[in-house]
Amino acid sequence: MTTFYNCNFFDGATEHNTENAWFTVDDHTGRITARGTGTPTSADQQVDFHGQYVMPGFFNVHTHITAGPDTPDGSYGHTEAESAVFATQNMHQLLQSGVTYIRQCGTEYDVDIALKRMQQDGKLPHTPHMMTSGKAFSMTGGHGDSSHGGHAVDSPGEMRKAVRTAFKNGAESIKVMATGGVMTPNDFMEDPQLSVAEMHVAVEESHHKRRIVAAHAEGNPGIQNAIDAGVDSIEHGFYVNEQEAHQMVAQGTYLTPTLIAEWAAAKDGIGVLPAWEIKKAEDALDDTYVNLSRAFQIGVKFTCGTDAGTPFNGFDQTPHEFEMLTKIGMTPAQAYQCSSINSANLLGVADDYGTLEVGKFADFQVLKADPVADVHAVVQADKQVYLGGHREF
C-alpha cells in the first residue's frame, strides 16, 4: 500500500477541492482503497505532495495517434511501420500531458489494435489506456476515404459486413463519417455523407456487442442524420441546432466539440494550409461557440476530445481544450467533468476510471496551482502523472 498525503484533492466527481487530503492505493491492483483528510492511515510507503493539487488524469475521446500535426495532410501516406512508431511517440506525449485514457477515432492500418495487444502484454510502457477504433467508415470518395485509413461502404449491407469484420480484427469502437470535413478538399461541412440507414446498421452491430459509435458530424443535415441513426456521440457538432440538442438530451447522445482543432487550423495554418481549408475552419469558428453554448444550456452532455493529430493540433494540447470549454459557459470544474464523468460514461468505463473515488484506478496528475480556481493550471509542462498509483512522468 502507498498513501499519498498533504495535497489538495479534486476527485472529479464534485466541483471543489478537499484540503489537507490523503488517499491510499493498493500497489498491486492500482486502485484507491481509502481516502480522507488530516493524518493519513499507515501504509508501506508514504508520499508527501507538499500541498500540491491532485486531480484525475484526462480522457481524450477523439485522437488520431497515427497522424502528424506538423504536416498539412496529417502525415497520411506513411508506411505501417512508420505509423506504428509515430503512434507510440504520440501516446507518450499524450500521457506526459496528463491524458491517461484515450479513444481512437480512426487509425491508419489498424495500428491501434496492434498497439493495444502490446499494451496488454506489458510491452508498451508509459502510454495511456486506449479504446481502439481501427479504421474509420466513410462513403466512397467521402471524408476519411483513405487507402490505409478507412473502410469505404456504400450500402447498409456493406456497412454490416465491414463493421463485423472490424470487430473480428479487434476494434473496440466504431467511427462513421456523417458529413464532409475541414480537411477534405472536395466536400463541405454541410454535405451529408453516410446515410441514416448505413449508420444505423453500424449502431445496431456495435450495440449488439456493447460497443459504441462515434459520428464525425460537423454540419447539417448530417448531424441530424447521425442522431436519428442512434450514434452514441457526435464528434465536432459545430452547427448543432436547438432541435438536435433537445433530441440529444432525450437520447443520451454525447457531444465531443474538439474546439482546439478548428482553432489551431485557423490560427496557425495561414500560409501553410490550403486557403480552402483555412476558410472552412474560420467559417466554423464564427458559429461554433454560439451553437455549443446553446447546446450546453439545453443540457447536452459534453465530452473531452481534441482531434489530436490534425494540423497544428499536437498530442500535448489536451489541457488547452478546457479553457475553450469555459468559453461556452462552463466553470473549470464542469469542464474537467466533461473528462472525468462524461467521457468515462460514454466509453462505459466509469466503474473503474474517470473520477478519483474509492475502488477506482488511481490515474491522476499532480499540479503546482489550483485547477479549480484557474483553468490554465492544467497546462503545466512538468506535471507529475500517475497510472494505477505508479508515477509515469
Write out the residue ranges for each language-model feature.
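Divalent metal-dependent hydrolysis catalytic cores, especially in the metallo-beta-lactamase
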Residues: 86-112, 127-136, 171-184, 212, ...
